[in-house]
């Protein structure tokens, strides 16, 4: 699949927030092997490829299949490098690379959702638009956010919110979700969180 020209430009022109810090800490030199565990739109890849100066290997990893056009654009621009895109969870891919004897001089991880997910409302990561609860990094996966919200127990939901979201009101939010189910859209989930948070804050000041 080819990127429309405007997306090609966005892929190449995307600038990471901590670009200078990443380059300074990794200190990439020509001839090295770089493993980018969260390739995304290729913003970090462009910076580090420039430091390789046409000599080296760049291994890109991402579980989101929609990154492929961005990788192909990157590959065309930096054709003198040895490049490879591996799809999957970076923890599993890194284990596979180690098993195959691949040694990296630098490994980069930029964790969290990216503009590739947030800028596409239909994927369900943004709360700015009322859309179905999806939130799958890999859209070929069967389990969606709606499945978890509607099928998990109250205790499981509270644990998810506490462990992965560091949510102060994890338990009351989980309790209200269970009482309001089914929830199918982002606005429904946002409403539950907002109402619960407001109630808990109000209760704390009584």
Predicted features along the sequence, with ranges:
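S-adenosyl-L-methionine-dependent methyltransferase catalytic core, i.e., the SAM/SAH-binding region
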Residues: 1-203
